Amino acid sequence: MGKLTILVLVAAALLSTQVMVQGDGDQPADRDAVPRDDNPSGMSGKFMNVLRRAGCPWDPWCG
């Protein structure tokens, strides 16, 4: 009877780890998170941001 109990506990542990690995990856902290827009001005704003950080080669581009 003791071996059966251990076998059932091991099987339950293996199944629970399989469920965690195959889950959708939703973390409790991320569930209510609001998606953040890192580039509110779109692709052109992202390009200008890169130019500003890298040192703009041509002044009219950098504004």
From Swiss-Prot:
GO terms for cellular component: extracellular region. Residues 28-39 have a biased composition (Basic and acidic residues). It is found in: Secreted. Residues 23-46 are annotated as: Disordered. It comes from the Eukaryota. Expressed by the venom duct. Residues 1-23 form the signal peptide. GO terms for molecular function: calcium channel regulator activity; ion channel inhibitor activity; toxin activity. InterPro entries: Conotoxin, Contryphan_CS. Disulfide bonds join C56-C62. Inhibits high voltage-activated calcium channels (Cav). Three forms of this peptide have been described. Am918 is 7 residues long and is hydroxylated and amidated; Am975 is 8 residues long and is also hydroxylated and amidated, while Ama1054 is only different from Am975 by an additional Trp bromination. An amidated peptide of 8 residues with identical sequence but without hydrolation is described in Conus buxeus loroisii venom (AC P0C250). Belongs to the O2 superfamily. Contryphan family. This is Contryphan-Am.
